[in-house]
Amino acid sequence: SETNATAPQNQLIPVPAGTVIQEKDREDELYGWDNEYGRHISDVSEFKASKHLVSNREFLEFIKDGGYRNQSYWTAEGWQWVQYKKVTAPGFWIQQEDGSYRFRSMLTVIDMPWSWPAETNYLEAKAFCNWKTEKMGLPIRLPSEEEWYRLLDYTQTPDVSDWEKAPGNLNLEDAASSVPVDKYAFKQGFYDVVGNVWQHTETPIRGLPGFQVHPLYDDFSTPTFDTKHNLIKGGSWISTGNEIIRSARYAFRRHFYQHAGFRYIASTAPIETPDDRYEIDPEVTPYCELHYGNEYFGIENYPEKLAQMALNHAQGRPKG
């Protein structure tokens, strides 16, 4: 059956250097969230990227090699999560008494679909890459957001407005699940450049140059500008609408599970980690302290003070 199919052997394919332009202006005809608007130009060095998304079969090798027991593969955050949750495999894997695995899909438990992309959180994907670095002797990691766009451009993957049909397992046009990682071919020899599952990146979200908070949803993006929310790209089988356009930028905490997997790259280029955190903005910090701290500039916690005033006012009043 398809779920028991043998997964393809993965390999690295070169991606030449190039300039990436991320931009969206206020006149764009497609809907967007505030973090999509602005303009960012980056020169991306050459790298190699895996032909396929990492399949369940490929991820199994990490598990069998003691990946969840070896602290050296994990970031400090990742190892803390492993210890706290006592994790031994991705969240949708169910280990049987004989040591084999089954898979919890959206609606039922099925035989392990070895050829489907491994659905992990960022922490697991990062640990896998560190393990792969040791095994391959190459600087293996997740792509940055800019490197993901460079692969998108190199494979000449069209934006949604130019589709006649979704180029991958997207928009609910194929299946109500993932499909094998070698089903949807793209140019230059790659598969699943978009679709099937979201793809983890190394990049914590921040606003693009020219970013402005939208007044109708002022806390959609800015609370995630804390270096703790990493971008996922490309959409999954169930992604529709804004989620599948080129400019989409969604980010989640690194321990969260989505319909997300990953592609790894080999690159010596450094990863730029933003430090423009929302909580240290001088205009925001007093507001946060006033609402969530104990006292700021001699002013008591505002919501707590209001609650205490309400309780005092209610003293002696009938309960009912």
Regions found by a protein language model. Name each.
Residues 31, 36, 192-210, 216-320:
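C-terminal, surface-exposed recognition/capping segments
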Residues 1-37, 42, 52, 67-242:
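Functional-site microenvironments in short loops/helix caps that host divalent-cation chemistry
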Residues 55:
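Acidic-aromatic/histidine active-site loop/patch
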